[in-house]
A protein has these predicted regions:
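Secreted, cysteine-rich disulfide-bonded mini-domains of extracellular proteins
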Residues: 22-131
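Sec-dependent bacterial lipoprotein signal peptides
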Residues: 1-18
């Protein structure tokens, strides 16, 4: 009798977790599905149709630089002023796991609230890759 109840509880828990997610059914935000935030070794590793570049961060970072506002970034990412003086489209996140779908453990991005969004988005966090 305990096994069916346990299975039912697990099924309900997974349905609840899926219902709380703001990601689309096939997983990830539009920006993640486009390749934003992925690790890379060179420009050829990033999807060319979006003009993503392999940015110079540890492990590389498929992204866009020189954005001026969130409107310059794919949905699910935001324009962030980085400490190096450049603006980048970084993924928006809730937790660190949101940042590292396509990154190796030795080059994980951090989900940080200590960033400056060009559009002044307070209360949000962004995936900041390691320098």
């Amino acid at each position: 009798m305990k096994a069916p109840k346990l299975l039912l509880a697990l099924a309900l828990a997974s349905l609840s977790a899926a219902a709380c997610s703001d990601d689309d059914d096939d997983g990830g935000s539009p920006a993640q599905r486009m390749g934003v935030g992925a690790a890379c070794d060179g420009g050829d590793d990033c999807p060319a149709d979006l003009t993503l570049q392999c940015l110079d961060f540890k492990g590389g970072y498929c992204g866009l630089e020189d954005c001026a506002a969130d409107a310059d970034c794919p949905r699910g990412s935001a324009c962030v002023e980085h400490e190096d003086g450049q603006n980048y489209c970084f993924l928006i996140c809730r937790d660190k796991v949101d940042c590292n779908w396509t990154r190796p453990a030795d080059a994980e991005s951090n989900c940080s609230a200590n960033v400056t969004f060009t559009d002044g988005n307070s209360g949000f966090k962004a995936c900041v890759p390691p320098s």
